[in-house]
Swiss-Prot record:
Protein name (Swiss-Prot/TrEMBL): Lipase chaperone
Keywords, alphabetical: Cell inner membrane, Cell membrane, Chaperone, Lipid degradation, Lipid metabolism, Membrane, Transmembrane, Transmembrane helix
Localization: Cell inner membrane
InterPro entries recorded: Lipase_chaperone (IPR004961)
GO molecular function, one term: unfolded protein binding
Function statement: May be involved in the folding of the extracellular lipase during its passage through the periplasm.
Name of encoding gene: lifO
Organism: Burkholderia cepacia
One GO-annotated biological process of the protein: lipid catabolic process
Amino acid sequence: MTAREGRAPLARCAVVYGVVGLAAIAGVAMWSGAGWHRGTGTAGELPDAAAAGGAAAAPPQAALPASTGLPSSLAGSSAPRLPLDAGGHLAKSRAVRDFFDYCLTAQSDLSAAALDAFVVRQIAAQLDGTVAQAEALDVWHRYRAYLDALAKLRDAGAVDKSDLGALQLALDQRASIAYRTLGDWSQPFFGAEQWRQRYDLARLKIAQDRTLTDAQKAERLAALEQQMPADERAAQQRVDQQRAAIDRIAQLQKSGATPDAMRAQLTQTLGPEAAARVAQMQQDDASWQSRYADYATQRAEIESAGLSPQDRDAQIAALRQRTFTKPGEAVRAASLDRGAGSAQ
């Protein structure tokens, strides 16, 4: 894999800096199973104290060091905190799903039994000896049952995203499986996501209804938007603004604008703070590309040295840790490495 292959388009990378918003319903992520977005935070929903409904994080503990039993795909990272309520029980929060999705990132490295053991250790590292420990284990088993049920669907639940009827059926099917396997955890795990998907699907149905005039479509879309809770409506407005910003960034990149010219343009459309974040992102991206290129060269030398698979992987993991020292960088590099391997 070349350094160029490791580059995400700047407009897409901007999500890390608060410039972009939600993915469209037609995106692949809508139909994926578990998919915690690691390290960089790109395009993922990060645990949020407010979203946890006032839930407190688990009592502060030292995070497990990367060398303590972490699979290579998670090297250099630490698990999200499991939230607790005021009584010390596991809080019903999306943050719990984020924790398990983080652990599931390692499923390509581990057998099912080893993955279970890994999750048990990660839970114990935060909740050992508490009532919440048993609760977290129970929720993990439920979540695994949910994912196993999804895997048994035809084509693992994949649908033709141009078939709105199939999308509706898939949504209903997944919601049913979630409620059956997760019970009262289905709402904190998937409630907000399902609401957004149903809303987006309703918009698509209106937009693609050939019996409606443009004026009627606009009227129905406006009425649908009024059904949104106030906070969701405000969030949607921000998303619309951010999508416009993405388009503008892409246009500036395509025109070959200099960093100073891009910053001046973005200051007009996004404001000085957002423009400064994009400028910083450019610098960080350039630094990343340079370091990944050097790393890829050294990794290729290790791969061609005729080492045993275990020695080769150990040396590459050590190289990755030396090269990428910021939180999440080693995980990102490992993910790019796996992508390079699958493309060969």
